[in-house]
């Protein structure tokens, strides 16, 4: 590979089209260079000042002849109005923000470049635009020059060495607020009229930066960081160095926002800021280690929230929001190892999943518990210092942590990142002995098995112990009678635990995290047919009067899933009791539990929905934490599509819009299905929300038959729209996953259909969907 030193880029914009002149300074011994280029018109190429031969081959710009120092390319590009990847126009209020999203392989839609994470370079950007527009990029503006034809030129400071996927350009009538109290300057940029809702995010960002600078012992490297609200955004956020982009619901929150909205903003801001060190300062060599970027940022975001907002119990949220989803996805035979080998860059999109984020973060938590917090931190600090402004691999981090801890973790880590899945630990007690045995946990018995190196933690008769289970089974003999046992202390281990005697587990002092883990384990044991329905509902019965907010929300989620699948309310007593327990909660976690429970009960119980819906007349003035539940209750009892649609159109805040989308998706009138899809195709619902809306419709058991029929009859139209919007098939994959709900009543028909529409890029989500259909069909037979 050539050594790329620097890109000098000049772009002249007219509307959404631009002409570019790019100089690339490099060292190369090659007689032929291949750059990445997509949807760009190449006007001319010069090598060291002389015209040189070139041709376009697929996504490659091939340049012939040896280049000693300088490559100059003149080209023309266009910001897309259809897709929301690469460089595109994000529409709002009849206007449009030009913005970019380059991870993983979309910088090539912006400029010809070496679009590879290991090919770092410095970037010097100049942009010519109409006067009155503002331009944002990774670095501060060096100067603004008046130009002819009513235009100005923004010239930006040069970036440090960085990967192409971290480059950013934004052009709009940005409204900004900033915190200049210390370095770096923190600036929040929004479309006009929304910046005041960014004060919470700015305050979080300032405190998180201070926390990370202390934790990593390395200052933030740039003079400023922008937090940018983008009106249409495929991802939740993107860590462009010094110019972080967010969809609105991941950035804006104020005093009127719900607790869940504030938590989301804090977590996403903290996640993206963690990338400024872990991902930007030190970058993966290749996308095989994508998980390291994402899992570490996830892990650190919860650690920083613990520091900033102790009342939110971020450790409980890490289990509830990350580990549980990762365990669920990792229990399918279609899962992949955390470290997945990527040959084709277009496979990368499939890696942005619960395995890379949630499982990775959970494994890091497990290793931190194994080696100790300070040893773990010291290893991370050494790693960042060793590879800053460069590229690294996962093994480099393990070596650094091993050196700091004085014990090797390489073998344990290799087990967890190169093997798919995870184990269930069977705990069998007999006499004065306890036997631990392991087997790979899968929802369907596929015959797959692995033996993992499992760092087991336990308490027997209230005494703490550890065991590295690196074979199928091991036994512990006691000097006294067995009174109680619990395994997976604080739920730090990425495994499930099945007890032969639940009474022994409940006789131990289970804390909030261990209760949450047990409840989630036994739900999955029901799905996997390892326990019967009576045992499962017996576990739920032990928590009818729980005040553990995480357990309350988890059981509510399980009961709601059963309702979505089979249109049966299996847990009304539990939910009614939980309403009583959390109705007057004053703490944030209690309020979160209350809003979760009443939202579920509004969907499942018409009588409850009728009572709650009376608050809809006062909707603008009620507590934001219950607004979504009230809107759902109104939808369930009134089937009033038009009123909800008018509210959706009238709201200018995405947090409010999303609540109404949840309500529209809860309507029980099948005639809304065609109307909602028309709104999607006409982009009267934000393109970024397409997957969420279709998935929500598929969950609704009252209209699911019509939704499934529509998707099956119009699959090509849906496929074309989603592929265009998301720049590829990954958006379609998430819709296909939700189609597993279609298979509840007609499993064979849906599986046959999925096989018929299958193509390479969505093979995995189709297999996932088919597997879930089989799980749900079996569950239907086993429930009362």
Swiss-Prot record:
<feature type="binding site">
    <location>
        <position position="271"/>
    </location>
    <ligand>
        <name>Zn(2+)</name>
    </ligand>
</feature>
<dbReference type="InterPro" id="IPR024571">
    <property type="entry name" value="ERAP1-like_C_dom"/>
</dbReference>
<dbReference type="InterPro" id="IPR045357">
    <property type="entry name" value="Aminopeptidase_N-like_N"/>
</dbReference>
<keyword id="KW-0031">Aminopeptidase</keyword>
<feature type="site" description="Transition state stabilizer">
    <location>
        <position position="357"/>
    </location>
</feature>
<dbReference type="InterPro" id="IPR027268">
    <property type="entry name" value="Peptidase_M4/M1_CTD_sf"/>
</dbReference>
<feature type="binding site">
    <location>
        <position position="103"/>
    </location>
    <ligand>
        <name>substrate</name>
    </ligand>
</feature>
<dbReference type="InterPro" id="IPR050344">
    <property type="entry name" value="Peptidase_M1_aminopeptidases"/>
</dbReference>
<feature type="binding site">
    <location>
        <position position="275"/>
    </location>
    <ligand>
        <name>Zn(2+)</name>
    </ligand>
</feature>
<dbReference type="GO" id="GO:0005737">
    <property type="term" value="C:cytoplasm"/>
</dbReference>
<protein>
    <recommendedName>
        <fullName>Probable aminopeptidase 1</fullName>
        <ecNumber>3.4.11.-</ecNumber>
    </recommendedName>
</protein>
<feature type="binding site">
    <location>
        <begin position="236"/>
        <end position="240"/>
    </location>
    <ligand>
        <name>substrate</name>
    </ligand>
</feature>
<dbReference type="Pfam" id="PF17900">
    <property type="entry name" value="Peptidase_M1_N"/>
</dbReference>
<dbReference type="InterPro" id="IPR034016">
    <property type="entry name" value="M1_APN-typ"/>
</dbReference>
<dbReference type="Pfam" id="PF11838">
    <property type="entry name" value="ERAP1_C"/>
</dbReference>
<keyword id="KW-0645">Protease</keyword>
<keyword id="KW-0378">Hydrolase</keyword>
<dbReference type="GO" id="GO:0016020">
    <property type="term" value="C:membrane"/>
</dbReference>
<dbReference type="GO" id="GO:0043171">
    <property type="term" value="P:peptide catabolic process"/>
</dbReference>
<dbReference type="GO" id="GO:0070006">
    <property type="term" value="F:metalloaminopeptidase activity"/>
</dbReference>
<dbReference type="GO" id="GO:0005615">
    <property type="term" value="C:extracellular space"/>
</dbReference>
<dbReference type="InterPro" id="IPR014782">
    <property type="entry name" value="Peptidase_M1_dom"/>
</dbReference>
<dbReference type="GO" id="GO:0042277">
    <property type="term" value="F:peptide binding"/>
</dbReference>
<keyword id="KW-0963">Cytoplasm</keyword>
<dbReference type="GO" id="GO:0008270">
    <property type="term" value="F:zinc ion binding"/>
</dbReference>
<dbReference type="GO" id="GO:0006508">
    <property type="term" value="P:proteolysis"/>
</dbReference>
<dbReference type="Pfam" id="PF01433">
    <property type="entry name" value="Peptidase_M1"/>
</dbReference>
<dbReference type="InterPro" id="IPR001930">
    <property type="entry name" value="Peptidase_M1"/>
</dbReference>
<keyword id="KW-0482">Metalloprotease</keyword>
<feature type="binding site">
    <location>
        <position position="294"/>
    </location>
    <ligand>
        <name>Zn(2+)</name>
    </ligand>
</feature>
<comment type="similarity">
    <text>Belongs to the peptidase M1 family.</text>
</comment>
<dbReference type="InterPro" id="IPR042097">
    <property type="entry name" value="Aminopeptidase_N-like_N_sf"/>
</dbReference>
<keyword id="KW-0862">Zinc</keyword>
<feature type="active site" description="Proton acceptor">
    <location>
        <position position="272"/>
    </location>
</feature>
<keyword id="KW-0479">Metal-binding</keyword>
